Design a protein with these regions (language model features):
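Active-site/ligand-binding loops adjacent to catalytic centers
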Residues: 1-47, 93-121
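Generic serine detector
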Residues: 13-16, 53, 73, 81
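Active-site nucleophile and cofactor-binding loops and adjacent substrate-binding regions
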Residues: 28-30, 47-55, 79-81
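Short amphipathic alpha-helical surface patches that serve as generic macromolecular interface elements
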Residues: 35, 54-61
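Glycine-rich beta-alpha junction loops
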Residues: 6, 10, 33, 55, ...
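Catalytic phosphate/nucleotide-handling subdomain of diverse soluble enzymes
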Residues: 59-120
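Hydrophobic alpha-helical bundle architecture
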Residues: 40-52, 62-66, 70
Length: 121
C-alpha cells in the first residue's frame, strides 16, 4: 500500500477494522489523478497539499462529481494531513511529465507475498 509521501506502507489496525465492519470503503486512485486533484485544491484553496493528502482530495472530487451527476446534495469530508511545501520536488516531477501511473498486477502481488512467506517462516 503506497500513498504519495507516506513512509508507512501498510494498513493501520483501526482503519482495517473500520473497513472490515463496512464503515468505510477503500479506493485506489492513480498517481496522476491525485496530482491533478492536488493542483485543483491548491488553485482553489491556496494550500499546496502533501502528496499523501492528494489521494484523499482525489477521492473527495470523485464523490463530488458523482453527487453532481446524481443531482444529490452531499456533505463530503476528507482529511488534509499536511501541506506539500517540503514535497515540491514531487510536484516538479509531475509538471515535467516524469510521473506515471503504475498498477501492481495480481501476479506481482502474489510473488511478493510468496517471498514474504518464505522470509517469515
Amino acid at each position: 500500500i503506497h500513498a504519495g509521501g507516506l513512509r508507512y506502507h501498510g494498513a493501520g489496525s483501526i482503519v482495517s477494522q473500520l473497513l472490515r465492519d463496512g464503515l468505510i470503503e477503500a479506493q485506489a486512485v492513480p498517481q496522476l489523478e491525485t496530482f491533478r486533484a492536488g493542483l485543483l485544491f491548491a488553485r482553489t484553496e491556496g494550500i499546496v497539499p502533501a502528496p499523501e493528502s492528494t489521494h484523499a482530495i482525489a477521492a473527495a472530487v470523485r464523490e463530488a462529481l458523482r453527487a453532481k451527476e446524481e443531482g444529490a446534495s452531499k456533505t463530503i469530508l476528507f482529511n488534509l494531513s499536511g501541506h506539500g511545501m517540503i514535497d515540491l520536488y514531487a510536484y516538479e516531477q509531475y509538471f515535467a511529465d516524469k510521473l506515471q501511473d503504475y498498477t501492481v498486477t495480481d501476479a506481482e502481488l502474489r510473488r511478493t507475498i510468496d517471498q514474504l512467506d518464505r522470509i517469515i517462516k
